[in-house]
Amino acid sequence: SESRLLSAYKSGVTGSGVVVETDYGRYVLSNRHVVGYAREATISFVLKDTTLVYEHCVVKAVSHNEDLVLVCLPDSCTQPAIELSTEVIEDGQDIVAAGFPGLAGKPSWQVTKGSVSNANLRIEEDNTVYIQHTAPIDPGSSGGPLLIKQGDTYQIVGVNTYKAFWRDNVGITIPVDAV
């Protein structure tokens, strides 16, 4: 559902994120590079007939090693959260990437399908394990969820971080266990 994803705006820059819930509250999970070093972010939920905007949302936690961020949502925000998956991801598994990469200068909703091409991609430069997948992602998709279907619902298996521009159909995702 479009209401479950969002676009975070920072000085005219957009990115994606997803609502998650913990024992400590409700947050937007995204990439650190989406919010940069800001202490607050404006979160917008682009719904079918309206856009909900929450300003001055506090950046609660930042992981520079994994390029992840949690932004607090106000109590007045009732957008549903998506559950984090505990399933072990395997090569060949079907996945869905979602986000708001934008089209014609405006954020636009995008859902793409693909499969896991390397469940344990290791990149020497940053000594991090990623999920490599074939679902198309574009600039602005950063911070959006990589999802698997579990029964009638979807669960988050990772946070889309970047695409390999030097190869076709290569998306790079931070696994949910890094959260």
Regions found by a protein language model. Name each.
Residues E2-V28, V53-H56, V111, G143, ...:
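A conserved glycine-rich beta-strand in the N-terminal activation segment of trypsin-fold
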Residues S7-Y9, V59-A61, T134-D138:
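Short Gly/Pro-enriched turn/cap motifs at secondary-structure boundaries
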Residues V18, P136-N160:
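Catalytic nucleophile loop of clan PA
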Residues V19-E21, V59-A61, G99, N118-N120, ...:
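A residue-level detector for short acidic-glycine micro-motifs
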Residues V20-E66, L73-S76:
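Catalytic-histidine neighborhood of serine endopeptidases
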Residues S30-G36, G99-P101, V157-W166, V176:
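Short beta->alpha transition motifs characteristic of CBS
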Residues Q79-I131, P136-S142, Y162-G171:
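Flexible, gly/ser-rich surface segments that form the specificity/activation loops bordering the active-site cleft
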